[in-house]
Amino acid sequence: MTKRYWNIDLEEMMRAGVHFGHGTRKWNPRMAPYISAKRKGIHIINLTRTARFLSEACDLVFDAASRGKQFLIVGTKNKAADLVARAAIRARCHYVNKKWLGGMLTNWSTTEKRLHKFRDLRTEQKTEGFNRLPKRDAAVLKRQLSRLETYLGGIKYMTGLPDIVIILDQQEEYTALRECITLGIPTISLIDTNCNPDLADISIPANDDAIASIRFILNKLVFAICEGRSSYIQNS
């Protein structure tokens, strides 16, 4: 895998608050190598390590995108939901930004059935098929469609398991991470000071609570994916 330059600036990361970890009482000792200091009861993340692992992650996603691989971005915190959707759409990635449904990947056959149902209902709605039904039946189907849109809207074009999964909060998305580990799907995960750095294939130490921090990391990864996609198109 070729190493590239991704313009990861330490001062820019500081302005985004990437270096702020959790309180010193709420930490995972395995994160010690990624912590540079304690300040006012808060662990400070070593941004040099962040830059190194973020650069590695960018190299990985660029390489995968340049070979036409598929990505899934998972971030279900309310405050990050819109950010996740916009970033994923920009890079033509699948995404889950509302709720991870248990077994979404490990029980893929069930997820596929839900996606088929979702597509059928969307087609029915577009062709005004609901208007030909009794009001009560139409209302039931509209509720089903709304629910499916909420939980599966970001993966509606997914036809198989993703090649790489990007996880924006290890603790919040632990079920998703475990499913990826079970299936052997490579993962990139943001890890705050209360996380386990040994679970994902590439763990990026960073503040996973502040929107500015999540945006900074996600924008770098999405840029690398977009660059890789451009390379794939040029070489096709």
Curated annotation (Swiss-Prot):
Which controlled-vocabulary keywords does the entry list?
Answer: Chloroplast, Plastid, Ribonucleoprotein, Ribosomal protein
- The name of this protein is Small ribosomal subunit protein uS2c
Sequence similarity:
Belongs to the universal ribosomal protein uS2 family.
Higher taxonomy: Eukaryota, Viridiplantae, Streptophyta, Embryophyta, Tracheophyta
The record's section on Pfam families has: Ribosomal_S2
List where in the cell it is found.
Answer: Plastid, Chloroplast
Recorded GO cellular component terms are: chloroplast; mitochondrial small ribosomal subunit
Gene name of this polypeptide? rps2
Extract one GO BP annotation from the record: translation
Tell me the domain of life.
Answer: Eukaryota
Q: Which terms does the record give in the GO molecular function aspect?
A: structural constituent of ribosome
CDD domains, per the entry: RPS2 (cd01425)
Work out whether the entry's keyword set contains Isomerase. Answer: no
Record the organism: Capsella bursa-pastoris (Shepherd's purse)
